[in-house]
Amino acid sequence: MLDREGFRPNVGIILLNARNEVFWGKRIGEHSWQFPQGGIKYGETPEQAMYRELHEEIGLLPEHVRIVGRTRDWLRYEVPDKFIRREIRGHYKGQKQIWFLLRMAGRDCDIHLRATEHPEFDAWRWSHYWVPLEAVIEFKRDVYQLALTELSRFLNRHARVPLSPYGTHGPHGMHGRHGGPRSQALSRAQQAQQADADCNAEAAHATEHDSPATPVSTSRSTDD
């Protein structure tokens, strides 16, 4: 689905953890890293497309994130001809994107790269918000800069510690705050700490595969 100017509507996702680090995914079978993104289907709103892509690419559900902000307008980039399939050259010009800034509300092990039969990434990592843009494929750098800059004003909004494995009813939620035997609270806290440790170990194992210090650029078009 292209607009009259030849741009495909698309959403981009900048996912933050509690330390304001951002999620980077490694393209499957490649040595290139990028933010999650994907096209908006006919009849979808940008927000609906964002939640669909979030699940398809990294396995997260709406309850695992909070929307912190989004870009006011479409951000566009043109794709060089060498990256465009021959059959659509002359019609397809590039992408126009609405970017969402999300805050992780779940745990690292809620991220699943094989949530669908057609995974986009085979590894992931958290990285500093202002990762050098030399690491991004050249024709997308301006859009990344615009999105990161516009959304940076939201960085301290809704900053929080990730949810415990008990949600709002665990040792760090309603029940933990408002009473219960001390011994039970301590026991639940110990269980939560162990669950978080197991989760972090699982997530660390998932990110160990070929993770560079910073994402590196790719020579392949990432216009999906």
UniProtKB/Swiss-Prot annotation:
Cofactor(s) it depends on: a divalent metal cation
Alphabetically ordered keywords of this record: Hydrolase
Domain Nudix hydrolase: 6-149
UniProt short sequence motif Nudix box, positions renumbered to this chain: 38-59
Record-linked SUPFAM superfamilies: Nudix
Compositional bias ranges of the Polar residues kind: 214-224
EC number: 3.6.1.-
A GO molecular-function annotation: pyrophosphatase activity
One Pfam family from the record: NUDIX
Cross-referenced InterPro entries: Nudix_hydrolase (IPR020476), NUDIX_hydrolase-like_dom_sf (IPR015797), NUDIX_hydrolase_CS (IPR020084), NUDIX_hydrolase_dom (IPR000086), RppH (IPR022927)
Comp. bias intervals (Low complexity): 181-204
Annotated region described as Disordered, given as residue ranges: 165-224
Function description: Accelerates the degradation of transcripts by removing pyrophosphate from the 5'-end of triphosphorylated RNA, leading to a more labile monophosphorylated state that can stimulate subsequent ribonuclease cleavage.
Protein family per UniProt: Belongs to the Nudix hydrolase family. RppH subfamily.
Protein name, as recorded: RNA pyrophosphohydrolase
Organism: Cupriavidus necator (strain ATCC 17699 / DSM 428 / KCTC 22496 / NCIMB 10442 / H16 / Stanier 337) (Ralstonia eutropha)
